[in-house]
Amino acid sequence: MKIIATLDAPAAIGPYVQGKIVNGLLYASGQIPLNPLNGEIVGDSIETQTEQVMKNISAILKEAHSDFDLVIKTTCFLKNIEDFSRFNAIYSKFFDKEFPARSAVGVAGLPKNVLIEIEVIAEVKS
């Protein structure tokens, strides 16, 4: 088991790590739209926040020697399920080949009152 940590993604705001690699798979903790440099929330729209979350995930994938083409599954938590189509428009831009399996769930609230949180499971390049 290997812990993944990068300064290019936000530091954990609780008792968890950015990700762990186990048996060739990366399990990345849920990412919210925080600026990795100062920990501040980026944007107030679902589009801007989704873009930042995906950038944070990209940094974790890179640190783990993976990328969006190797993502197996995502779990997406939306504060406002009405944002679903606008969220999809940004999310889909990050996948070049195939989309991963996915669950998308509307929730009552998220840490720091953000609009989106996404966690991923991805294959790691050997």
Curated annotation (Swiss-Prot):
GO MF term (any one): deaminase activity
Q: Which residues cross the membrane?
A: none
Q: Which InterPro entries match?
A: RidA (IPR006056), RidA_CS (IPR019897), RutC-like_sf (IPR035959), YjgF/YER057c/UK114 (IPR006175)
List the CDD domains hit by this protein, alphabetically. YjgF_YER057c_UK114_family (cd00448)
Any matching Pfam family: Ribonuc_L-PSP
Entry GO CC: cytosol
Q: Kindly give the PANTHER family that the UniProt entry links to this protein.
A: 2-IMINOBUTANOATE/2-IMINOPROPANOATE DEAMINASE RIDA, 2-IMINOBUTANOATE_2-IMINOPROPANOATE DEAMINASE
Purpose: Implicated in the regulation of isoleucine biosynthesis.
Family membership, please give it: Belongs to the RutC family.
Protein name per the record = Putative regulator AldR
Query: What is the native source organism of this protein?
Result: Lactococcus lactis subsp. lactis (strain IL1403)
